[in-house]
């Protein structure tokens, strides 16, 4: 069987196409009708050759599918592509609005801000609006509204940004800190207690859970380690005395520890576990 039937070209053409495939089928049918011997004495070899020709034909057709668009692009590169590039700005008049929508969606999902908030008097939010619009960078190029609506929107978004960055309101921090010092014997709130704390603080359950994880590592564990090293001071009163000594930026708040917790006070007013 002639292998040229597998990759025959169209008669008078340079590129293989479906027309050549039909012509090959016609030539093969004529060969069958003429009863010319195209099979050998080895059936396995004949079957292998037929399958190989079919596979090669499939690959040749797939290559042709990928080659035809490339030829068209090369032919029209000097003319059509340049015209399309010149018409691009006119066909996309709402590109800045689309960039603004993209930025707002990513801000709501907690992504990193690429632009700085614009001033209330109006102006571009990015450092160079012209460069960002020419290069297509995803910076916020919208002009701030001169009315008070833009200021109100910025004020509404500020608490959400603070929560996403892990900066909780002082009121919420004081509530969770009070619960922590009131439950020093077991500083692990249950799911119901987490829900109640989230409702009282205005935070999410995940934020409350993360705060207690950090508090047990930054507050409780250092006190336990220090008490193990020092062990100085008188024993804590079973009735429970005001506890102080750990403050960050919040006002000092005194709490009473449960009677089951062994504590000690040193001369500097710091309290520790026994």
Curated annotation (Swiss-Prot):
Its family remark reads: Belongs to the TALE/MEIS homeobox family.
Q: Where is the composition biased (Polar residues)?
A: 123-135
Biological process terms from the Gene Ontology for this record are: angiogenesis; animal organ morphogenesis; brain development; embryonic pattern specification; eye development; hemopoiesis; positive regulation of cell population proliferation; positive regulation of transcription by RNA polymerase II
Q: Which UniProt keywords apply?
A: DNA-binding, Homeobox, Nucleus
| Keyword DNA-binding listed | yes
Domain spans labelled MEIS N-terminal: 12-65
Q: Which residues bind DNA?
A: 161-223
Name of the featured protein:
Putative homeobox protein Meis3-like 1
Q: Which gene encodes it?
A: MEIS3P1
Give the chief site where it resides: nucleus
Listed PANTHER family: HOMEOBOX PROTEIN TRANSCRIPTION FACTORS
Which SMART domains does this one have?
Answer: HOX
According to the lineage, what is the superkingdom? Eukaryota
Q: Name one GO molecular function term.
A: DNA-binding transcription activator activity, RNA polymerase II-specific
What would be one Pfam family of this protein? Homeobox_KN
- Which GO cellular component does the record give, naming just one? nucleus
Record the organism: Homo sapiens
Region listing for Disordered, in residue ranges = 108-167, 228-248
